């Protein structure tokens, strides 16, 4: 059993290096690795020396980061679910997204931001759950404090988000800090915006103590909000992302259009306009929209007109099982029948050109 696995791990770095574009965050592939920490650290291609050092030194943190990859990729797919590019991932590509992120587009800006945020979230959560040797609950949240409602005692387990941010910065930014080009600066900016987004939704939760809930004493702690809050916030930043160009000395950005404001540390920035993602394009990494489900009654990005890029759509009748004739029974249950429902599903037609199906 061990011999075949050893052979796979021996060839994996060479295979992935050959298949993968240069511009990518190689640590994203950690979601697909398993086994010992040494196997994981040594067989994720593209990690720089600082990342490998941290990987070997903190295998428990790496496991948390690897589990977090699935969470932030799911969040990315949720946010883009109604768009032509839907944050689709490629199983045999350690960049996860293929060539689409080679372009310094607003989609790249979002992915780097949400992935950086995902690392902060995953590490901080693992700290609070006692899964990491190097951190625990926030040690600064002790003693008595005061807010608008009066005095309270710090108690429970406050999320140690400062540790999550510090480790995420050291690990995620390590590769970009080795580069001095424009794309590295863009990635660093968006990585930071993602980290700041998680901390933005840190909230204070309290529990009252006293006779009949009189709240004569309050115990409070700081907790991260659900990751969806961060995803929604970064989605708004994606829609308001600011196109920039490098300044003359190559140390920072200036807005491409002087009518727009200078980006803040919370904004997402990008250099290049996005492709339309209408057709499968090997160079752009676009899978196209042929076969994508569209909404016939929508006027948004998921409408058949927009999603299908004017190519039209096919309609098929499908049946699905739904709950129907639900009744409330005392006490206290709702009982339903299983019913078959017929509905029309609309999918985008393929382009008429013969080369639309060229593999990406």
UniProtKB/Swiss-Prot annotation:
Any single biological process term in GO: cell-cell signaling
Primary location: secreted
Cellular localisation: Secreted, Extracellular space, Extracellular matrix; Secreted
Keyword Glycoprotein: yes
Protein family (similarity comment): Belongs to the Wnt family.
Name used for this protein in its record: Protein Wnt-2
Record key words, sorted: Developmental protein, Disulfide bond, Extracellular matrix, Glycoprotein, Lipoprotein, Secreted, Signal, Wnt signaling pathway
Primary gene name: WNT2
Entry comment on modification after translation: Palmitoleoylation is required for efficient binding to frizzled receptors. Depalmitoleoylation leads to Wnt signaling pathway inhibition.
Lipidation (O-palmitoleoyl serine): 212
Pfam families: wnt (PF00110)
UniProt cross-references to Gene3D superfamilies, sorted A to Z: 3.30.2460.20
Signal sequence coordinates: 1-25
